[in-house]
Amino acid sequence: MKYIPGVAWVALLALGCATGPAGAQSVDIKTIVSVGGPPVVLNQNSQLNMAGVFMIGGSTSATVTQNGTNNATGILQFGGTNSASIGQAGMNNFAFVGQTGQSATSLVSQLGTMNTGAVVQFSAVNNSTIVQNAP
């Protein structure tokens, strides 16, 4: 039997999903790195949504909205004033927010069968809300 490296298997799997029948699972994966940039707003509507946002700057702001079967978001913010908002609707939802600065505000809202959310804040002023609902 011929050996196929792990990277080749991942490529074949991705190709199979991309060129499969109309009922194949759709995937949307985004990684955003922002240094002193404008606010990040990301909307994802695939069956599998994954987002990673890493921000450094005086004032950071990120909003991620995901509607799909499986949703995962990680936001890391290092700034003076940090703001993060994650909205997820799907069967399985995972959200993580990490913030360090003078003030940190975050909101995580999840509607699904299995919801996991965590907020870690290291700031002088911290405000966080996690709302999880199962249908």
Question: What annotation goes with each model-predicted range?
Answer:
Residues 5-7, 15-24:
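Sec/Tat signal peptide C-region and signal peptidase I cleavage site
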Residues 24-135:
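Low-complexity repeat regions of mature extracellularly deployed or surface/particle-associated proteins
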Residues 1-3:
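N-terminal secretory signal peptides that target proteins for export/translocation
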Residues 6-9, 30-31:
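Short helix-onset patch at the extreme N-terminus, typifying the N->h transition
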